[in-house]
């Protein structure tokens, strides 16, 4: 997957369109990501050993990765990602707009 934990992303479709957030976790087998502060759902819980008191908990739910776009840390714009190899053979992610290296893969 092109998106990794800790990346800043922009939601491009759905009820939270236009919101930005940091990726909390990535679920590669399902091709989903969990973004901080986006797609918040309410979960009703019963009392158990961990939580003495039940109640309604708000937590972020996963989004399909096609609904988010990476924000380049250099040009601060949503961008697609290209992959290139450095001279020493390492594979890196590159911003399509500003051609800067985003980070090591």
UniProtKB/Swiss-Prot annotation:
HAMAP family: Ribosomal_uL24_B. It comes from Dictyoglomus thermophilum (strain ATCC 35947 / DSM 3960 / H-6-12). GO terms for molecular function: rRNA binding; structural constituent of ribosome. Transmembrane segments: none annotated. Part of the 50S ribosomal subunit. Belongs to the universal ribosomal protein uL24 family. Pfam families: KOW, ribosomal_L24. The keyword Plastid does not apply. SUPFAM superfamilies: Translation proteins SH3-like domain. GO terms for cellular component: ribonucleoprotein complex; ribosome. One of its GO terms (biological process) is translation. The keyword Ribonucleoprotein applies. Keywords: Ribonucleoprotein, Ribosomal protein, RNA-binding, rRNA-binding. InterPro entries: KOW, Rib_uL2_dom2, Ribosomal_uL24, Ribosomal_uL24_CS, Ribosomal_uL24_KOW, Translation_prot_SH3-like_sf. One of two assembly initiator proteins, it binds directly to the 5'-end of the 23S rRNA, where it nucleates assembly of the 50S subunit. This is Large ribosomal subunit protein uL24.
